[in-house]
């Protein structure tokens, strides 16, 4: 079909693909896989050969499932590639072996596109608000966006579920790091000249959607984003997911959250909880929509 676009978001842990009808602003199909792009990055400063091969395998699976040519896809990549010393060689390797040409986008563009996706998601879910806070917990960075009427304010924090997990396993300073980051979040919030007290707190990315999925009783294999979208989580839901991580066997956890997410869910939950505390919020609305949807909507708007 002439009115289709494929968008790919290669994150620090996840690889997400969307087939999108850009004339009617509708999702046709999608694919998601954990590729662990940032594995080992904090120690070596490099994207590993093993990670690159996982990305190429994921592209090949996705192109067969969604029937597309990788060279025609709109492909973006984020924090892991921004940080890696060998990012250009890594991107050249991916293009040479798959045809997919990735663009490294900066944190502000990543936040703008994710915000675009959430604005459309709010309309779709009939949630009428111009003022909200958006949290995007990534693998290598975490973005906080405050949307106030026609303006938005972005702060990108240099930590994510993968990098903080790797760092804490190396130095054991997780809670110290979280406290330091809380100070940084508060500093950013103090620059705003309006109150966010009544702003809904919206969260996207794998950690919030996984906790929502656990709350709703889904397994990894019957996850339904249409039901997850709009789910409201509170601090007790976060605490329940942390308890489950300690109580369940590895086999049970793989069925619940998927193989590539188990090792990061604990730290991801602590990061999520950090923002509840720093923002002084009691609950959070979860959306599955994120960067890949934002890239697709941005493309659709450019074709209008």
Locations of the language-model features?
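Short glycine-aspartate micro-motif
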Residues: 5-9, 132-136, 201
């Amino acid at each position: 079909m002439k009115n289709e676009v494929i968008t790919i978001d290669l994150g620090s842990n996840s690889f997400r693909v969307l087939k999108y009808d850009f004339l009617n602003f509708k999702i046709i199909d999608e694919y998601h896989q954990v590729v662990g792009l940032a594995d080992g990055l904090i120690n070596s400063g490099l994207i590993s050969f093993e990670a690159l091969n996982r990305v190429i395998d994921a592209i090949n699976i996705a192109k067969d499932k969604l029937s597309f040519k990788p060279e025609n896809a709109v492909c973006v990549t984020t924090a892991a590639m921004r940080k890696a010393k060998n990012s250009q060689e890594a991107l050249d390797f991916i293009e040479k072996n798959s045809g997919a040409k990735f663009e490294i986008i900066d944190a502000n563009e990543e936040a703008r596109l994710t915000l675009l996706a959430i604005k459309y998601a709010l309309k779709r879910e009939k949630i009428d608000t111009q003022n909200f806070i958006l949290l995007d917990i990534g693998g290598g960075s975490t973005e906080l966006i405050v949307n106030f009427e026609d303006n938005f304010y972005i702060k990108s924090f240099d930590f994510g579920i993968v990098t903080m997990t790797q760092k804490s396993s190396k130095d054991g300073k997780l809670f110290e790091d979280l406290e330091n980051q809380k100070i940084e979040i508060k500093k950013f919030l103090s620059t705003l000249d309006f109150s966010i007290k009544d702003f809904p707190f919206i969260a996207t990315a794998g950690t919030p959607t996984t906790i929502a999925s656990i709350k709703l009783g889904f397994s990894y294999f019957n996850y339904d984003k249409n039901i997850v979208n709009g789910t409201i989580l509170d601090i007790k839901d976060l605490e329940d997911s942390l308890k489950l991580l300690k109580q369940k066997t590895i086999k049970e956890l793989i069925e619940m959250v998927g193989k590539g997410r188990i090792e990061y869910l604990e730290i991801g939950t602590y990061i999520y909880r950090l923002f509840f505390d720093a923002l002084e919020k009691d609950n959070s609305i979860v959306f599955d929509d994120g960067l890949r949807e934002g890239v697709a909507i941005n493309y659709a708007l450019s074709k209008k």
